[in-house]
Amino acid sequence: MANYFNTLSLRQQLDQIGRCRFMQRSEFSEGCDFLKGKKIVIVGCGAQGLNQGLNMRDSGLDVAYALRQAAIDEKRDSFQRASGNGFTVGTYKELIPSADLVYNLTPDKQHSSVVEAIMPLMKEGASLGYSHGFNIVEEGQQIRSDITVVMCAPKCPGTEVREEYKRGFGVPTLIAVHPENDPQQQGWDIAKALASATGGDRAGVLESSFVAEVKSDLMGEQTILCGMQQAAAVLGYEKMVADGIDPAYAGALIQFGLEAITEALKIGGVTNMMDRLSNPAKIKAFDLSEQLKDMLKPLFGKHQDDIISGEFSRTMMEDWANGDANLLKWREETGQTGFENAPEYNGKIDEQEFFDNGVFIVAMIKAGVELAFDVMVEAGILPESAYYESLHETPLISNTIARKRLYEMNVVISDTAEYGNYLFANAAIPLLADKLMPSIGTELIGKPFAAASNSVDNKTLVAVNKAIREHGVESVGDTLRGYMTDMKAIVEAV
């Protein structure tokens, strides 16, 4: 199979990568009614499979799970998750032939084999759903012409899809219809119903394309969402311990600090996050973030270029064929880092303390969000898509780190995201360790920022505030956050 994106003309590529329209609430007035009474079979019961299925069932849809015979016979985790939550579970042959919609929520690396196995079993005129377009765009999967192919892509790990739904909210979601497979012209009705059933319409839905989703999703998860947070955690912890900070406190400051800091980001963007700092600390964090952007822009650019060209996908699929040799090696190395093995902290850290003692973390988040947004927009991805991939999903990933550190993050994200995360972090960590960290002291990570005076130059502060508030990610973010009127604070203190 050939990379689908690379078979398109330049004009078609630009058209597909630039597809993005923020949908109005009124477009979801019928909720998920289009799928009610239809038989939906989810293939796979991992993080996305289980949690989307739970939301869909709670929204009134008929959901069952199709698993491989071996998974059922051996009562593997996927079988235990589905059956333990009261779902009907059967084999492909038992469930697929009667399904109106088959929702493929298996890991990316399994998509080709799964689709080849289920497609002959699907009835005439059925629909096939994805939550990530890698199989269609990067692998070039060919789908039977009578089958409608849609996407419903929540912009966060599966666990957060469920948690936000239970809070009465949802997560921003991209929907798309594969232009080669919409024979009955019902693709958008199906995709909209899926977004409503999983809770996405409560947080904002973008009408997108398979291409735009893949190219922006890969960039976001590799850089700010996972790679920058892993780099910040590893570097920040090592620096604090080297400078005499209690290892238990250092671990907690990062583990829970990322969540607290990015919660401010979620509620009010970079502006709100930076406003949580004192004026002297804000100016320092701004200057540090600009320094970080200068250092990291070539790396961000390389990742985006490799994603657009297909080079990233090619090398990752080579690793798949090699038994995930690099992925497993990098996973083991991450598990051996100081941060992952930090002792538990028994004290209490006030929520404001995460900001006061974590100026370095704030600067890393600001730099990562703005760089990822800028580089995506430069590549032709529209600002709305770039915002969701660079800013809104960041706190949702931070929430996973707060649970069980980097291990939890890398467990709940996809293997594709995990591979890209390591690829980025493994380049960013030594770069920053050499060029930046020698200049970082405990006043920037570990202890309160202590300026010689709380006084600041008014013109400097005005210029800093102007630069923060007029950045593109803040302009589009202010509009999109206006849709999220039901957001609930989830962080207080530890």
Curated annotation (Swiss-Prot):
Where does this protein hold NADP(+)?
A: 45-48, 68, 76, 78, 108-110, 158
Gene3D superfamilies, alphabetized: N-(1-d-carboxylethyl)-l-norvaline Dehydrogenase, domain 2, NAD(P)-binding Rossmann-like Domain
**Top-level taxon of origin:** Bacteria
Is Repeat given among the entry's keywords? yes
Q: What is its EC number?
A: 1.1.1.86
Residue ranges annotated for the KARI C-terminal knotted domain, each copy included: 209-344, 345-487
Domain KARI N-terminal Rossmann spans what residues?
14-208
Which residues are responsible for catalysis? 132
Which positions does UniProt annotate for substrate binding?
414
Q: Which reaction does it catalyse?
A: (2R)-2,3-dihydroxy-3-methylbutanoate + NADP(+) = (2S)-2-acetolactate + NADPH + H(+); (2R,3R)-2,3-dihydroxy-3-methylpentanoate + NADP(+) = (S)-2-ethyl-2-hydroxy-3-oxobutanoate + NADPH + H(+)
> Which SUPFAM superfamilies does the record cross-reference, listed alphabetically?
6-phosphogluconate dehydrogenase C-terminal domain-like, NAD(P)-binding Rossmann-fold domains
Q: Alphabetically list the UniProt keywords.
A: Amino-acid biosynthesis, Branched-chain amino acid biosynthesis, Magnesium, Metal-binding, NADP, Oxidoreductase, Repeat
Q: From the Swiss-Prot or TrEMBL record, what is one GO molecular function term?
A: magnesium ion binding
Cofactor descriptive note: Binds 2 magnesium ions per subunit.
Cofactors (names): Mg(2+)
GO BP: any one term: L-valine biosynthetic process
Give the GO cellular component terms, alphabetically. Answer: cytosol
Residues the record lists as binding Mg(2+) 1: 217, 221
Q: Which residues bind Mg(2+) 2?
A: 217, 389, 393
- Recorded family membership: Belongs to the ketol-acid reductoisomerase family.
Q: What does this protein do?
A: Involved in the biosynthesis of branched-chain amino acids (BCAA). Catalyzes an alkyl-migration followed by a ketol-acid reduction of (S)-2-acetolactate (S2AL) to yield (R)-2,3-dihydroxy-isovalerate. In the isomerase reaction, S2AL is rearranged via a Mg-dependent methyl migration to produce 3-hydroxy-3-methyl-2-ketobutyrate (HMKB). In the reductase reaction, this 2-ketoacid undergoes a metal-dependent reduction by NADPH to yield (R)-2,3-dihydroxy-isovalerate.
Report what the protein is called. Ketol-acid reductoisomerase (NADP(+))
- High-level lineage: Bacteria, Pseudomonadati, Pseudomonadota, Gammaproteobacteria, Alteromonadales
